[in-house]
């Protein structure tokens, strides 16, 4: 048994898909733990459909998941590493996946992961995925860290498993009930500050101002460059994550993929009372216009996410005045 699914009320088809995802995840955890012994998993091997560099492990993970899901209830397989949707058969499910999230961390032994999303399949491969994230029937991730864990929602809460290395199966832990609300942590890549829109800069300036600023408390910044790792920390400890669009070429809509990354993470976060937006609009209500569409992404504690939206709702002149008054990074 690759994963404990008893009592979750899953259909046999969905349970089979989850079992196969878990089995590949367990295999990848072992492969990652042996990086460099036989193969350099961080070796560059090309670029993916979005123009990002591919590592050997990206391709290996994609191949492993696709092969494991062939012949199952998954009719359509959409991967960040594939240009188009791959038709696997005549099943009833459509699975979107980022096979290896955070691949820049492979060679520095920092947590990486797999993100997946499952929809009911339609008659068309693309329309099976170009739909509201609220229509997902499952969304989750596998994190390959000091522990290998699997976190997933089927629309009725958030379930949590950890890989038992002795049995090579995922043992179920208590469900994740709610996000911690009083956490003074935020995650953003501050090196891009000069490129951000003024509402994001104003929001971050207020956090950096700490106890002497308008928020009246000190905050700590985190940045791991692995969406799975950031998500796992927020589920365990609370806080807020921001990856805004910015002024750089190719970054107007951020860099995270709507279908493969943001929709499933938003599905999880909202199940425990959190929020997930593009800075202004609800991610789960948005319709991606193409398979590899990108979106700005803000998620975490609902109150913090709502505060980011409030900064965007200010008239432009008010945001500019706020920024000029509180802009701590100004030279």
Swiss-Prot record:
Binding site for Mg(2+) 2: 98, 101, 261
Gene Ontology CC entries for this record: cytosol
Pathway as given in its UniProt record: Carbohydrate biosynthesis; gluconeogenesis
Cofactor: Mg(2+)
Reaction equations catalysed: beta-D-fructose 1,6-bisphosphate + H2O = beta-D-fructose 6-phosphate + phosphate
Keywords, alphabetical: Carbohydrate metabolism, Cytoplasm, Hydrolase, Magnesium, Metal-binding
Listed GO MF terms: fructose 1,6-bisphosphate 1-phosphatase activity; magnesium ion binding
Residues the record lists as binding Mg(2+) 1: 80, 98, 100
Any GO BP annotation: fructose 6-phosphate metabolic process
EC class: hydrolase
Localization per Swiss-Prot or TrEMBL: Cytoplasm
Annotated substrate binding sites: 101-104, 189
CDD domains for the chain: FBPase
Pfam families (alphabetical): FBPase (PF00316), FBPase_C (PF18913)
Cofactor: how bound: Binds 2 magnesium ions per subunit.
EC number(s) on file: 3.1.3.11
InterPro entries, A to Z: FBPase_C_dom, FBPase_class-1, FBPase_N, FBPtase, Fructose_bisphosphatase_AS
Summary of subunit composition and partner proteins: Homotetramer.
Family of this protein: Belongs to the FBPase class 1 family.
Note: There are two genes for FBPase in R.capsulatus.
Classification via NCBIfam families: PRK09293.1-4
This protein's name: Fructose-1,6-bisphosphatase class 1
Native source organism of the sequence: Rhodobacter capsulatus (strain ATCC BAA-309 / NBRC 16581 / SB1003)
